[in-house]
From Swiss-Prot:
Name of the molecule in the record: Outer membrane protein assembly factor BamA
Subunit structure: Part of the Bam complex, which is composed of the outer membrane protein BamA, and four lipoproteins BamB, BamC, BamD and BamE.
This protein's encoding gene: bamA
Signal peptide: 1-20
Protein family per UniProt: Belongs to the BamA family.
Keywords: Cell outer membrane, Membrane, Repeat, Signal, Transmembrane, Transmembrane beta strand
Function, as annotated: Part of the outer membrane protein assembly complex, which is involved in assembly and insertion of beta-barrel proteins into the outer membrane. Constitutes, with BamD, the core component of the assembly machinery.
The keyword Transmembrane is annotated on this UniProt entry: yes
Length: 804
């Protein structure tokens, strides 16, 4: 179109001029049609000036230059005596850009692409560019299977040579795959091969990855999957000859035909390593584990190359090249692998930098580094630094980049780029809890206090059954070696009867301190001391409670519901943590084991020990870690020492949002059995002096397990994927009392055997976790499908400040 205008303009110029072959001298230049563009700007675009002698070639160059400026959609050059007359039609200015009908592509993404093409508000409208954008967008829709899609640019003229630009989308529906055919396969059936594809012509209900909607990119991925399937099974000559994609007349169906040549199976004849091995030949050769006689395997070859690169990377060779050339012998069906290694230069680290840590101090991040500045680069040490930063839980994302230093042959900078998340919360207000009723809460919790890495918490709770306050602080680097120091003080006024537990009131306060000793990258040992004072009152005569009092030599009365006593205990606290999770919040891979215990020491009124073990394992089932299987367990056991029992207020409980969802908090397990008698108003019907109830008392042993399937959250933008998590789960748990005596009198009163651990409760449901500005929120809906008499269901539950 532009060349056509050039030709017309040149013809007009030639027909309107009378001069010799040598041209003429320009005495003046006049413009017609300028509106937005200044005369000076137009003159600067022209190669011709007043006083120049011009000919046909000069005029042609002038026309080209004016078109190239991007300001004009039509240019004509005429001669009027010694004056050059330039007639132009300016391109209109874009006043606004809007979109309509786009669902698959967001407005922000469209604006970015338009701006990259020079289409933005205030700029001139280039209709050729606009046409290219229309075609490009339609091509995009075709690539994702929407063949009926159309994109039209609607240009509405406005005064002063301005226009409104509106892109109107008609996306249509995605074409679905009707059938996938593979032609030429003999060793494997078509069904077996297609079962590895993402694109499917039939998707079973249980397949959460398969998709019938055609996408060109997914097809390319499936072709690579097909190629790898054959190469991993010895078919070294396998080839995909062609691929045909056919569209049904209504553009709603797709037929895919893949033509392949399988070839024969080949075995390894040997592996030969050559090149610049940087003195690590023995280690490199140990990585070439493919033995003569085994089937050729493409994945093993790739893994071997990656292992060699990682090995060299640990020694500072940041950019090694490893290429494997297969020498195929068709006569004896063997493949000899020639591995050529070029280690390249050895690099050392000039600087380690951090970007994005607006709150966290550099020192907090730098102390997690295992790679040192000025030392040889170690890729494994760099990766450990990334892993440790992720496990801190301060960041949504952590990326690392090794950048070569300009002008230096052997220096690199290591740059860690982090995106900080909200690590604290301030909360003051009134809420409603599923277990606590109306709740008044105030608290400040900051896991990265002022960017120092300190964890500081001030919390208080007031509800129907509890008044609680606590101050805690932890310094994760009390020493430069990573020994941590933490401590807390607390006060708790707990009315168990109002919490649907057995009847007693406990006012307690205490203090404890703990040192943590890192053993290696993943293991930490903890040791500490604690003190707690318990003041119990309003104790109704209950069998398990009175059994404990008897073990202390307390003469509690079974005819009174106003018994009480106090105890002061000093404890030795210990623990061990193994943490190999990929990050500190919302992990997607790895495992964590946490062992905690305490035992009373001389000077205590009680003598007991208590141990808990928590485990969690995350197993991703896709490369992007969006689909994850989570297995969790919690075990607990405690007992008395020296003939005494563990205090009943130290019992384990289960049920609620953090253990077995779908059951009321702390409701699973043994229930209170009260003594009945004159003056006691604790039961309606007593048998043999005992009265059973639905009040939970907990037990000295507990086992809880959970299987969870974490999925992408439906209808949620990728932008929020790191702050919201959805999962389907199944929970199971049991609490029991190993010291319970299932006597004949108990059986006659209809009391279950609370020493039996097989009374397992089970539930299943769905959960949503959200890292909100107020802190982590957890919502769950669960349906119990195995419960016992006295259990209380609670399908919908929520919790603040708990993640797993």
């Amino acid at each position: 179109m532009a060349m056509k205008k050039l030709l017309i303009a040149s013809l007009l110029f030639s027909s309107a001029t009378v001069y010799g072959a040598d041209g003429f001298v320009v005495k003046d230049i006049h413009f017609e049609g300028l509106q937005r563009v200044a005369v000076g700007a137009a003159l600067l675009s022209m190669p011709v000036r007043v006083g120049d002698t011009v000919n046909d070639e000069d005029i042609s160059n002038t026309i080209r230059a004016l078109f190239a400026s991007g300001n004009f959609e039509d240019v004509r050059v005429l001669r009027d005596g010694d004056t050059l007359l330039v007639q132009v039609k300016e391109r209109p200015t874009i006043a606004s850009i809007t979109f309509s009908g786009n669902k698959s592509v967001k407005d922000d993404m469209l604006k970015q692409n338009l701006e990259a093409s020079g289409v933005r508000v205030g700029e001139s409208l280039d209709r050729t560019t606009l046409s290219d954008i229309e075609k490009g967008l339609e091509d995009f829709y075709y690539s994702v299977g929407k063949y009926s899609a159309s994109v039209k640019a609607v240009v509405t003229p406005l005064p002063r040579n301005r226009v409104d630009l509106k892109l109107v989308f008609q996306e249509g529906v995605s074409a679905k795959i009707q059938q996938i055919n593979i032609v030429g396969n003999r060793a494997f059936s078509t069904e077996e091969l297609i079962s590895n594809f993402q694109l499917r012509d039939e998707v079973p209900w249980w397949n959460v990855v398969g998709d019938r909607k055609y996408q060109k990119q997914k097809l390319q991925g499936d072709l690579e999957t097909l190629r790898s399937y054959y190469l991993d099974r010895g078919y070294a000559r396998f080839n995909i000859d062609s691929t045909q994609v056919s569209l049904t007349p209504d553009k709603k169906g797709i037929y895919v035909t893949i033509n392949v040549t399988e070839g024969d199976q080949y075995k390894i004849a040997g592996v030969e390593v050559s090149g610049n091995l940087a003195g690590h030949s023995a280690e490199i050769e140990s990585l070439t584990k493919m033995q003569p006689g085994e089937l050729y395997n493409g994945t093993k070859v790739t893994r071997m190359e990656d292992d060699i690169k990682k090995l060299l990377g640990r020694y500072g060779y940041a950019y090694p090249r490893v290429q494997t050339q297969p020498e195929i012998n068709d006569a004896d069906k063997t493949v000899k692998l020639h591995v050529n290694v070029d280690s390249g230069n050895r690099f050392y680290v000039r600087k380690i930098r951090f970007e994005g840590n607006d709150t966290s101090k550099d020192a907090v991040l730098r102390r997690e580094m295992r790679q040192m500045e000025g030392a040889w680069l170690g890729s494994d040490l760099v990766d450990q630094g990334k892993e440790r930063l992720n496990r801190l839980g301060y960041f949504e994302t952590v990326d690392v980049d090794t950048q070569r230093v300009s002008g230096s042959p052997d220096q690199v900078d290591v740059v860690y780029k982090v995106k900080e998340r909200n690590t604290g919360s301030f909360n003051f207000g009134v809420g409603y809890g599923t277990e606590s009723g109306v709740s008044f809460q105030v608290g400040v919790q900051q896991d990265n206090w002022l960017g120092t890495g300190y964890s500081v918490g001030i919390n208080g709770t007031k509800n129907d059954y509890q008044t609680y306050s606590e101050f805690s602080v932890t310094n994760p680097y009390f020493t430069v070696d990573g020994v941590s120091l933490g401590g807390r003080i607390f006060y708790n006024d707990f009315k168990a009867d109002d919490a649907d537990l057995s009847s007693y009131t406990n006012k307690s306060y205490g203090v404890d301190g703990t040192l943590g000793f890192p053993v290696n990258e993943y293991n930490t040992l903890r040791l500490g001391l604690g003190y707690v004072h318990n003041d119990l009152s309003n104790m109704e005569p209950q069998v398990a409670m009175w059994r404990y009092l008897d073990s202390l030599g307390q003469s509690a009365k079974t005819t009174s519901d106003d018994n009480g006593f106090s105890a002061d205990d000093f404890t030795l606290n210990y623990g061990w943590t193994y943490n190999h999770l990929d990050r500190g919040f919302f992990p997607t891979s790895g495992s964590r084991v946490n062992l905690n215990g305490k035992v009373t020491i001389p000077g205590s009124d009680n003598e007991f020990y208590k141990v808990t073990l928590d485990t969690a394992t995350y197993v991703p089932i896709d490369d992007d870690h969006k689909w994850v299987v989570l297995g969790r367990t919690r075990w607990g056991y405690g007992d008395g020492l020296g003939g005494k029992e563990m205090p009943f207020y130290e019992n384990f409980y289960a049920g609620g949002s953090s253990t077995v969802r779908g059951f009321q908090s702390n409701n699973i397990g043994p229930k209170a059995v009260y003594y009945s008698g004159p003056g006691l108003d604790n039961c309606d019907k007593a048998v043999g002096g005992y009265c059973s109830s639905d009040d939970a008392v907990g037990g000295n042993a507990m086992g809880v397990a959970s299987l969870e399937f974490i999925t992408p959250t439906p209808f949620l933008s990728e932008k929020y994927a790191n702050s919201v998590r959805t999962s389907l789960f199944a929970d199971a748990g049991s609490v029991w009392d190993t010291n319970w005596k299932n006597t004949a009198a108990m059986r006659a009163a209809g009391v279950p055997d609370y020493s039996d651990p097989s009374n397992i409760r089970m539930s299943a449901g769905i959960a949503l976790q959200w890292m909100s500005p107020l802190g982590p929120l957890v919502f769950s809906y669960a349906q119990p499908f195995k419960k016992y008499e006295g259990d209380k269901a609670e399908q919908f539950q929520f919790n603040i400040g708990k993640t797993w």
